[in-house]
Amino acid sequence: MPTINQLVRNGRTDKVWKSKSPALNKGFNSLKKKSTDISAPQKRGVCTRVGTMTPKKPNSALRKYARVRLTNGIEVTAYIPGIGHNLQEHSVVLIRGGRVKDLPGVRYHIVRGALDTAGVDKRMQGRSKYGTKRPKPAKK
């Protein structure tokens, strides 16, 4: 516990809040060629690289990821959720925030079923998270 004298000299400092998805908090004015501080829930971007990486220590897999250049000029690494994807270089994708715990440096997810990204095939449960349309009912 600080003394009164220490508080008079220094005072309490507020905790500095830091965004977990900073690339979504920057906009870009293409007419003035200046970045702006307008945040967005999602951003559009173009894939510059699509590949797989291995997760951190206790886990083992080949996780799919894409390197994406956003409309604000920032390049980020985004995770491709679901089984199978149709992305390749120059695909236009929509990204949202949300990290992948066992992939270092991956702070964004690609939204399935938006722009060039197809939804997951033959998915029946949790379809909205993977951009899958409702299956047609079987005729009797």
Curated annotation (Swiss-Prot):
Residue numbers of 3-methylthioaspartic acid PTMs: D102
Keywords, alphabetical: Methylation, Ribonucleoprotein, Ribosomal protein, RNA-binding, rRNA-binding, tRNA-binding
Entry keyword DNA damage: no
Gene Ontology CC, one term: small ribosomal subunit
One GO process term, biological-process aspect: translation
One Pfam family it belongs to: Ribosom_S12_S23
Example GO molecular function: rRNA binding
Disulphide linkage map: none
Gene3D superfamilies named among the record's database cross-references: Nucleic acid-binding proteins
Keyword Ribonucleoprotein listed: yes
Similarity-based family: Belongs to the universal ribosomal protein uS12 family.
Known partners and oligomeric status: Part of the 30S ribosomal subunit. Contacts proteins S8 and S17. May interact with IF1 in the 30S initiation complex.
General function of this protein: With S4 and S5 plays an important role in translational accuracy.
Stated name of the protein: Small ribosomal subunit protein uS12
Organism: Bacillus cereus (strain ATCC 14579 / DSM 31 / CCUG 7414 / JCM 2152 / NBRC 15305 / NCIMB 9373 / NCTC 2599 / NRRL B-3711)
